[in-house]
């Protein structure tokens, strides 16, 4: 408060008037209320403390896992869209600046912006086409490798098939030759006839298979005729083998039994004459032993020859059969590999067809984008031309009527 100065009073010393200064009255003391203190009805401070309003119900609620997941997804979407939002904000700021400048500038910048967006979309489509083209080229390279493997397997299958045919023909011819020898020598006529029949059936089976490969016999007929001929060939081979081994064993037993019976009868006859003439008995025993030795030697020689012939024929058949079985197994393995490679090749062709369809679709979309971009640019040019015509008409009107 400023002091009040008056000139009404004078001093007795000089008689001149001196200014009178009034001092302000002291202000009454007031007690300040501290935040949080409550007064009662008499004006005193209450000691109950601060009374706050009850919290809202939303404060006591807890966030569930679903809400947390939604918030997380929202944050991720915001993060992903940050770059796009920045790009859009830049475009919007540019458009806003040119909007405030002039309509013509805005239209020009709008056309440039649309053109840039179309170029970006076109670049994306071209990148997709290039990526799919690279994948297609990789598939083509894989298919070429598969084709080479298939060709090599086909050559190996052809070679193994030729080897199997050679062994098959050799087995059939050997069976016919050995059977003919057995029939001609009289060692085993029945078994030899069976071997000849088995060889003939084998050659017929090979001829039928060759005709089927050449296309002279249909596949449906071969499905029925092939197993029948094979079964007949196997049956005749088994029968001829059993008869060969069985005939040799029975013939050996019969020869041995006959020779033993003859020797026993000779010894009994010479023993009855022993009481008459000792010299004659000695001579008869020596003659009988010599005759028995001669006959047994001839019999064993015949048995050895027949056994050698049959053993040789059977060994030849076994060797040829083993070779034929090995070549047939190799041929089946090569054919299985060839079928596997053909399946892989067909799968790769299907993948290539799918990729080609995707590339064709992208090309169509790219052409549609080019057409839409051209339409938008034509529309913008029409708008600019229409505005130019309108301004020209306005400029050509008279100022006064």
Swiss-Prot record:
Residues 129-160, 345-379 form a coiled coil. The chain crosses the membrane at residues 176-196, 224-244. Keywords: Coiled coil, Host membrane, Membrane, Plasmid, Secreted, Transmembrane, Transmembrane helix, Virulence. GO terms for cellular component: extracellular region; host cell membrane; membrane. Its main location: secreted. It holds the Pfam family SseC. It is found in: Secreted; Host membrane. Disruption phenotype: The mutant strain displays a wild-type phenotype with respect to in vitro Yop regulation and secretion but it cannot translocate YopE and YopH into the target cell cytoplasm, fails to elicit a cytotoxic response in cultured HeLa cells and is unable to inhibit phagocytosis by macrophage-like J774 cells. Additionally, the mutant is avirulent in the mouse model. The yopBD mutant can secrete YopH at the same level as the wild-type strain in vivo but is unable to translocate YopH into the cytosol of HeLa cells. It comes from the Bacteria. It is a multi-pass membrane protein. The core secretion machinery of the T3SS is composed of approximately 20 different proteins, including cytoplasmic components, a base, an export apparatus and a needle. This subunit is involved in the formation of a pore, called the translocon, in host membrane. Interacts with YopD/SctB. Together with YopD/SctB, forms a multimeric integral membrane complex. Component of the type III secretion system (T3SS), also called injectisome, which is used to inject bacterial effector proteins into eukaryotic host cells. YopB/SctE and YopD/SctB are inserted into the host membrane where they form a pore and allow the translocation of effector proteins into the cytosol of target cells. Is an essential virulence determinant. Required for YopE and YopH translocation. Shows membrane disruptive activity in vitro. Interaction with the host cell triggers a signaling response, via activation of the small GTPase Ras, the MAPK kinases ERK and JNK and the nuclear factor NF-kappa-B pathways, and production of the proinflammatory cytokine interleukin-8 (IL-8). YopB/SctE-dependent signaling response is counteracted by YopE, YopH and YopJ in infected host cells. YopB/SctE is directly responsible for signaling and its insertion in the membrane is important to activate the signaling response in the host cell. Belongs to the SctE/SipB/YopB family. This is Type 3 secretion system translocon protein SctE. It comes from Yersinia pseudotuberculosis serotype I (strain IP32953).
């Amino acid at each position: 408060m400023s002091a009040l100065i008056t000139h009404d009073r004078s001093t007795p010393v000089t008689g001149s008037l001196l200014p009178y200064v009034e001092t302000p009255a002291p202000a009454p003391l007031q007690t300040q209320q501290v935040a949080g203190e409550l007064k009662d009805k008499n004006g005193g401070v209450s000691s109950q403390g601060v009374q706050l309003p009850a919290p809202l119900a939303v404060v006591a609620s807890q966030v569930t896992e679903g809400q947390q997941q939604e918030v997380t997804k929202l944050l991720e979407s915001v993060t992903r869209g940050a770059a796009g939002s920045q790009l859009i904000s830049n475009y919007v700021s540019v458009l806003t600046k040119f909007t405030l400048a002039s309509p013509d500038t805005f239209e020009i910048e709008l056309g440039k912006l649309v053109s840039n967006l179309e170029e970006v979309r076109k670049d994306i489509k071209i990148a997709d086409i290039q990526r799919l083209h690279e994948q297609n080229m990789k598939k083509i390279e894989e298919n070429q490798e598969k084709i080479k493997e298939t060709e090599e397997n086909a050559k190996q299958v052809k070679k193994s098939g030729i080897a199997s045919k050679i062994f098959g023909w050799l087995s059939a011819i050997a069976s016919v030759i050995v059977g003919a020898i057995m029939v001609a020598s009289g060692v085993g006529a029945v078994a030899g006839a069976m071997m000849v029949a088995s060889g003939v059936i084998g050659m017929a089976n090979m001829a039928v298979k060759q005709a089927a490969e050449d296309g002279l016999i249909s596949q449906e007929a071969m499905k029925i005729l092939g197993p029948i001929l094979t079964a007949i060939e196997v049956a005749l081979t088994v029968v001829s083998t059993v008869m060969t081994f069985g005939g040799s064993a029975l013939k050996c037993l019969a020869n041995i039994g006959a020779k033993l019976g003859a020797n026993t009868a000779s010894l009994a006859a010479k023993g009855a004459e022993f009481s008459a003439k000792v010299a004659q008995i000695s001579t008869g025993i020596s003659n009988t032993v010599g005759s028995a030795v001669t006959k047994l030697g001839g019999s064993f020689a015949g048995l050895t020859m027949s056994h050698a012939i049959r053993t040789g024929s059977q060994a030849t058949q076994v060797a040829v059969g083993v070779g034929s079985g090995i070549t047939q197994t190799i041929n089946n393995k090569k054919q299985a590999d060839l079928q596997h490679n053909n399946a892989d090749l067909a799968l790769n062709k299907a993948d290539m067809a799918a990729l080609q369809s995707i590339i064709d679709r992208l090309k169509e979309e790219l052409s549609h984008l080019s057409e839409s971009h051209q339409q938008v640019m034509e529309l913008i040019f029409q708008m600019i031309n229409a505005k130019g015509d309108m301004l020209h008409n306005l400029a050509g009107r008279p100022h006064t009527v």
